Amino acid sequence: MRQLLPGNTVWRNIRLATMDPQRQAPYGLVDNQALIVREGHICDIVPETQLPVSGDNIHDMQGRLVTPGLIDCHTHLVFAGNRAAEWEQRLNGASYQHISAQGGGINATVSATRACAEETLYLLARERMMRLASEGVTLLEIKSGYGLELATEEKLLRVAAKLAAENAIDISPTLLAAHATPAEYRDDPDGYITLVCETMIPQLWQKGLFDAVDLFCESVGFNVAQSERVLQTAKALGIPVKGHVEQLSLLGGAQLVSRYQGLSADHIEYLDEAGVAAMRDGGTVGVLLPGAFYFLRETQRPPVELLRRYQVPVAVASDFNPGTSPFCSLHLAMNMACVQFGLTPEEAWAGVTRHAARALGRQATHGQLRAGYRADFVVWDAEQPVEIVYEPGRNPLYQRVYRGQIS
């Protein structure tokens, strides 16, 4: 019988879906195990017969399923207002160009967010964050991008920092100043990119407000040359990069981001084989965002089979935002990725655990249940991981553990 050291906490009588690729079973499943936690990290995973049955720091989970904490690696969580009215207009036949001419589209969210007090933005974002936490999310990426000016971009990143300070969920903040051209630069997008590169990135990086730089390389966003200026600026400062690419057309954005060893290429509906090969060579994760595909009623699906063939890691995220994916649910995104894009449930699980961790540069500490990894995990009233993917409207979460503490 193994003796527990003082300060150790044990979860026993569990079915572990470790998501460890070194384990042969689907989902890295192992039965009749015990998880030993100390100081916020997993010390060991051992057969439960090696440990005492009961004690002050022993939690008997009665055979429940345990998985790594979920990771939502692509969200636009901090914003004000909503775009419900323009969604109704679109369904009644209005074009995006018509809506934009009336002040709608992303600029409507930018205007509302610029005008919103920081404390109000914080309260709005906190409610959304806790919704994701209630689904078992323990690591969350938050992008800026609804300021499109230095002061408001900084305000959004300060909100993300305030959320992180609550110590309820890990936050990975991303600067997405190159999200769209603001109205005041409508006729000078190159001038706006100069502002992003010469002012926003260096000043906000110096303040320690973000972990990575993102951009929107698209026909309705920024072209390849403008996008490369952003990537060059970030890389010169040693900042990891990522990109919204190939969502609505094939511009070569995935190849561009991969050339800069981007953490991830996101959306990728129009990705071609050359882009997939570049992602493999650049170590870039493909992030699927089925909520936007569904909400925009797109028809071009990401090349999932090509990604499999080239062994490119595939993550899945909510893309929660007011304009194209108003779905604050990672469970729903997992289901959509299977139904719409043809992922298997196991691939969807990998997409919100170990591959999502890689998309945030956290693969050495998050996304798997292994000795030395962070003790972020979820106990479910379920027998199999597929149950969480199969029925997204039902949340069988029993217990969420963050940094070794029940939360």
Swiss-Prot record:
Binding-site list for Fe(3+): H74, H76, H244, D319
Molecular function as annotated in GO: imidazolonepropionase activity; iron ion binding; zinc ion binding
Keyword rRNA processing assigned: no
Cofactor note: Binds 1 zinc or iron ion per subunit.
A Pfam family this chain is assigned to: Amidohydro_1
Gene Ontology BP annotations: L-histidine catabolic process to glutamate and formamide; L-histidine catabolic process to glutamate and formate
Annotated compartments: Cytoplasm
Pathway given in the UniProt record: Amino-acid degradation; L-histidine degradation into L-glutamate; N-formimidoyl-L-glutamate from L-histidine: step 3/3
Binding site for 4-imidazolone-5-propanoate: R83, Y146, H179, Q247, T324
UniProt entry keywords in alphabetical sequence: Cytoplasm, Histidine metabolism, Hydrolase, Iron, Metal-binding, Zinc
GO cellular component: cytoplasm
NCBIfam families assigned: hutI
Protein name: Imidazolonepropionase
Species of provenance: Salmonella paratyphi C (strain RKS4594)
Lineage: Bacteria, Pseudomonadati, Pseudomonadota, Gammaproteobacteria, Enterobacterales
